[in-house]
């Protein structure tokens, strides 16, 4: 009886209005907080300087290309102390993400838009990974903004603990999720394309507000702040941006023959394929793209594109011609003309900077970029000595980075980008 009287008193006429006023006040405060002038908010606690694995290393000098400091990094990496440093495992991340508030605070994720301009231009990301949970955490933290959207595709062959750790990280954010369908990714096969398509579909259905989609892998890292990325995307004015060039003759074998996955490897079966169901010739490119939401919608819904993708499923490395070709189909939103004058090289496209071993050399003698010391599948794994040069290219992201090969390169780049982003907030 007393409880009924209390409920009646609690929800009496004036009290109802009190709760309505309270709810309105909370909503108003939240909106004002998002749109307030950021210079009145102190983000100093989000700096990453103290995370430097060694106080002996000066990241400012590294970024300036100081030869002595870069040599110090190499020597530091050889020390027993550094090699035996504590590293977080999949299980560490599973445990840490059990308390999301603590995880977000400890890992210093940015939880508010840093500017009105960024808040008004949300970006979607597709991230394809299969191992190295700390790299995923570092990548996500470096690009994370609460107004953006993130789909993480975990290879179905990955360790269960890695998947659980990725799910744990994603569960701490309302705008981060693991793809609804996971593929068993085989190198150079259609499964790599399908992984991105799964995230495309999920991101398209999740939110209608994002402007552009950028696809990444676990060994990519940004070389621009979110604000810089937003401004570069705005300059595209709805056009897509990716590598798309005339198909070289030596790559035609890749789509003229039928391929199948045999014992975990893509194998040429020796049989000829029919001509692709397109009037557009095939163009060469890469797996990396920056595409508009309208492009994504067209790819997911257009029947001719669906037929083309079905045809491409038994070819070699379809990701290296599929997106490039779709970008040259006249009806596709944000596409380019078929004319060779519109060919776009990997150095001209902003999606990703990759240093190929066979193009490295003396820049003063015409090489596109200087040499690199460590390579994986002919691709440079960036070290601390590459950062000074790397920060002068116009690309949004670079590939590859690896904490097991050069932790300092990632740490110094991470520090630099975070400081640069927060520095813009000062009056």
Curated annotation (Swiss-Prot):
Matching InterPro entries: Glyco_trans_14
Positions bound to a glycoprotein: 243, 251, 254, 320, 341, 358
An example Gene Ontology CC term for this record: Golgi cisterna
Keywords tagged on the record: Disulfide bond, Glycoprotein, Glycosyltransferase, Golgi apparatus, Membrane, Signal-anchor, Transferase, Transmembrane, Transmembrane helix
Membrane-topology descriptor: Single-pass type II membrane protein
Protein name per its UniProtKB record: Beta-1,3-galactosyl-O-glycosyl-glycoprotein beta-1,6-N-acetylglucosaminyltransferase
EC number: 2.4.1.102
Origin superkingdom: Eukaryota
GO biological process, one term: leukocyte tethering or rolling
Tissue: Expressed in tracheal submucosal glands and epithelium (at protein level).
Stretches assigned to the Lumenal side: 33-427
Reactions this protein catalyses: a 3-O-[beta-D-galactosyl-(1->3)-N-acetyl-alpha-D-galactosaminyl]-L-seryl-[protein] + UDP-N-acetyl-alpha-D-glucosamine = 3-O-{beta-D-galactosyl-(1->3)-[N-acetyl-beta-D-glucosaminyl-(1->6)]-N-acetyl-alpha-D-galactosaminyl}-L-seryl-[protein] + UDP + H(+); a 3-O-[beta-D-galactosyl-(1->3)-N-acetyl-alpha-D-galactosaminyl]-L-threonyl-[protein] + UDP-N-acetyl-alpha-D-glucosamine = a 3-O-{beta-D-galactosyl-(1->3)-[N-acetyl-beta-D-glucosaminyl-(1->6)]-N-acetyl-alpha-D-galactosaminyl}-L-threonyl-[protein] + UDP + H(+); a globoside GalGb4Cer + UDP-N-acetyl-alpha-D-glucosamine = a globoside GlcNAc-(beta1->6)-GalGb4Cer + UDP + H(+); a ganglioside GA1 + UDP-N-acetyl-alpha-D-glucosamine = a ganglioside beta-D-GlcNAc-(1->6)-GA1 + UDP + H(+)
Keyword Protein transport set for record: no
Function: Glycosyltransferase that catalyzes the transfer of an N-acetylglucosamine (GlcNAc) moiety in beta1-6 linkage from UDP-GlcNAc onto mucin-type core 1 O-glycan to form the branched mucin-type core 2 O-glycan. The catalysis is metal ion-independent and occurs with inversion of the anomeric configuration of sugar donor. Selectively involved in synthesis of mucin-type core 2 O-glycans that serve as scaffolds for the display of selectin ligand sialyl Lewis X epitope by myeloid cells, with an impact on homeostasis and recruitment to inflammatory sites. Can also act on glycolipid substrates.
Cytoplasmic compartment spans: 1-9
Record: glycosylation sites: 58, 95
